[in-house]
């Protein structure tokens, strides 16, 4: 009875606190009544309610090196005591180091082989905005009719107007009226021949194609290699700038440095974007381009006040130093195998698990039912997990998650799935 009373009082205190906080927030989020106060590794803590959670979300694929990583804390402390911000009116040494490191490590690990230059910004949507602007600039230098963009259904590229315009979900776009014009959405699951036919017909008015090698929010769907090769060859043939959005699927999440690493050169993009894990929670984004794109850019064509600041780049240097190591990437694959084995065992017991898919530690678990109850009941039992559509769980933990923690989280998930299956 005493414990029940403590839980009840904690719940009241949590509700009171979250209600007072919500009073000052714009109404664009639907958050549960918990208040996260600290984290360590793959654990998060709500000290208001005296709760501990296993984290399978990692800030939506952001904290790839875990929460409150001691080494990152040291980097932030040291750099913030040295130099935080200068603007892009001047060079800073951390940005210079990081740009070189990002380009060269991309090539070394089998990614974009003609990567040449980097534009730093503060988020994924900004990185995609830059990619769209750069590609339109490139196209208009050769033909004023090439203004269109090809994107794909179930895509997500960001919330600002440009990246939102190439995000397919109507619920995100329609409340804001007209978007950037000349955007066409194709179905990435269509046969290659159908995609090729449309692209060839519309190539004279198409500036760029943007896609996620693995669709994240759209349900964790991996684009087959042969399709990426075909699209890459087609874009090169018709002078269409190819953009890969690697914001969620990149930087080690698949057990490769980039999701397009080790693909044939024909499938490599002209531009790829990254953010999320790049700063392990510190706001940072980057747009990596080849010479074909860079050669048309001039001073003043684009810019940012904060992008590439010394503090962000110091963190980025540290993150990349740790992730761009083959043993680290191999360890991601090993942990993915632990997840896959556990989830396949779960699927055998509960047939309403329709499919398990993804790559590395970007995993989708599709059910025949809505997953909102699974998410809420898991949270009640100490596991944080998120969705990718109405009937798909998305598992995107820290890349450093321990195998014991994986198994503990899967035990919680199994208890919830078992309860829902029998109800």
Swiss-Prot record:
The modification N6-(pyridoxal phosphate)lysine is found at residue 276. Keywords: Amino-acid biosynthesis, Aminotransferase, Arginine biosynthesis, Mitochondrion, Pyridoxal phosphate, Transferase, Transit peptide. This is Acetylornithine aminotransferase, mitochondrial. InterPro entries: AcOrn/SuccOrn_fam (IPR004636), Aminotrans_3 (IPR005814), Aminotrans_3_PPA_site (IPR049704), Class-III_PLP-dep_AT (IPR050103), PyrdxlP-dep_Trfase (IPR015424), PyrdxlP-dep_Trfase_major (IPR015421), PyrdxlP-dep_Trfase_small (IPR015422). GO terms for biological process: arginine biosynthetic process via ornithine; L-arginine biosynthetic process. One of its GO terms (molecular function) is N2-acetyl-L-ornithine:2-oxoglutarate 5-aminotransferase activity. Pathway: Amino-acid biosynthesis; L-arginine biosynthesis; N(2)-acetyl-L-ornithine from L-glutamate: step 4/4. PANTHER family: ACETYLORNITHINE AMINOTRANSFERASE, MITOCHONDRIAL (PTHR11986:SF79), AMINOTRANSFERASE CLASS III (PTHR11986). Pfam families: Aminotran_3. It is found in: Mitochondrion matrix. It catalyses: N(2)-acetyl-L-ornithine + 2-oxoglutarate = N-acetyl-L-glutamate 5-semialdehyde + L-glutamate. Belongs to the class-III pyridoxal-phosphate-dependent aminotransferase family. The keyword Zinc does not apply. Its main location: mitochondrion. Its EC number is 2.6.1.11. The keyword Chaperone does not apply.
């Amino acid at each position: 009875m005493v414990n029940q009373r403590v839980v009840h009082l904690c719940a009241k205190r949590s509700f009171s606190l979250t209600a007072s906080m919500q009073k000052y927030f714009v109404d664009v989020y639907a958050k549960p009544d918990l208040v996260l106060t600290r984290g360590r590794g793959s654990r998060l803590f709500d000290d208001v309610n005296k709760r501990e959670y296993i984290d399978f979300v990692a800030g939506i694929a952001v904290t790839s090196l875990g929460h409150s990583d001691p080494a990152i804390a040291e980097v932030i402390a040291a750099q913030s005591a040295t130099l935080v911000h200068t603007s892009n009116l001047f060079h800073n040494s951390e940005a210079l180091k990081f740009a070189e490191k990002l380009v060269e490590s991309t090539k070394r690990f089998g990614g974009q082989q003609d990567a040449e230059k980097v534009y730093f910004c503060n988020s994924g949507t900004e990185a995609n905005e830059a990619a769209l602007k750069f590609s339109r600039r490139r196209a208009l230098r050769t033909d004023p009719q090439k203004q269109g963009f090809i994107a794909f259904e179930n895509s997500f590229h960001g919330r600002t107007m440009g990246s939102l315009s190439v995000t397919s979900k109507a619920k995100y776009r329609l409340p804001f009226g007209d978007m950037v014009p000349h955007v066409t959405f194709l179905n990435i699951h269509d046969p290659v021949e159908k995609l090729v036919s449309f692209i060839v017909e519309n190539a004279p008015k198409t500036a760029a194609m943007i896609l996620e090698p693995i669709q994240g929010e759209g349900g964790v769907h991996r684009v087959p290699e042969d399709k990426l090769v075909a699209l890459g060859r087609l874009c090169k043939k018709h002078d269409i700038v190819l953009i890969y959005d690697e914001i969620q699927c990149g930087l080690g999440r698949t057990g490769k440095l980039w999701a397009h690493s080790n693909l044939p050169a024909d499938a490599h993009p002209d531009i790829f974007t990254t953010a999320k894990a790049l700063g392990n929670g510190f706001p940072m984004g980057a747009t990596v381009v080849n010479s074909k794109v860079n050669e048309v850019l001039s001073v003043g064509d684009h810019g940012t006040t904060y992008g590439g600041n010394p503090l962000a780049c110091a963190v980025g240097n540290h993150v990349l130093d740790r992730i761009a190591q083959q043993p680290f990437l191999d360890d991601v694959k090993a942990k993915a195998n632990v997840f896959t084995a556990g989830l396949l065992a779960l699927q055998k017991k509960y047939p309403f698990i329709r499919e398990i898919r993804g790559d590395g530690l970007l995993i989708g678990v599709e059910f025949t039912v809505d997953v909102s109850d699974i998410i809420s009941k898991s949270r009640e039992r100490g596991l944080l997990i998120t969705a990718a559509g109405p009937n798909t769980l998305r598992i995107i933990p820290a890349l450093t998650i321990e195998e014991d923690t994986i198994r503990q989280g899967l035990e919680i998930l199994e208890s919830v799935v078992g309860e829902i299956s029998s109800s």
